[in-house]
């Protein structure tokens, strides 16, 4: 059984017991969270597709960790001008463990 849900503007395909890295959620480690915006649920041959969400479906999860991702570098380079600008960025994330899928 797996489900596709939406969080932080992105869609994630998950199954029970899986650990997923999401955009930052303002929750403490160990807190439980439910995602109501479930787009699709597949249980064997039974497929439920929402328009746009599946009514009554939920994905339950528990917050495992909060952190920051790897640094990415942004470089702006102007040729022949002896000028360049370099900047770094680390995005915050929340790791959650999927505890259940309710269809």
Swiss-Prot record:
Family, per entry: Belongs to the bacterial ribosomal protein bL21 family.
Role of this protein: This protein binds to 23S rRNA in the presence of protein L20.
UniProt record, GO biological process: translation
Pfam families (alphabetical): Ribosomal_L21p
The UniProt record lists the keyword Ribosomal protein: yes
GO MF annotation, one: rRNA binding
Subunit architecture: Part of the 50S ribosomal subunit. Contacts protein L20.
Xref: PANTHER family: 50S RIBOSOMAL PROTEIN L21, LARGE RIBOSOMAL SUBUNIT PROTEIN BL21M
Top-level lineage group: Bacteria
Keywords from the named record: Ribonucleoprotein, Ribosomal protein, RNA-binding, rRNA-binding
Protein name: Large ribosomal subunit protein bL21
GO-annotated cellular components: cytoplasm; ribonucleoprotein complex; ribosome
Transmembrane segments: none
UniProt keyword annotation of Thylakoid present: no
């Amino acid at each position: 059984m797996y489900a596709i849900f939406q969080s932080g503007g992105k869609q994630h395909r998950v199954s029970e017991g899986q650990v997923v890295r999401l955009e930052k959620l303002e929750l403490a480690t160990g807190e439980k969270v439910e995602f109501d915006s479930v787009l699709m649920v597949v249980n064997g041959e039974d497929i439920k597709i929402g328009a746009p969400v599946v009514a009554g479906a939920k994905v339950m999860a528990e917050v495992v960790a909060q952190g920051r991702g790897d640094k990415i570098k942004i470089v702006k380079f102007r040729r022949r001008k002896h000028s360049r600008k370099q900047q770094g960025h680390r995005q915050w994330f929340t790791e959650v463990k999927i505890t259940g899928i309710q269809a």
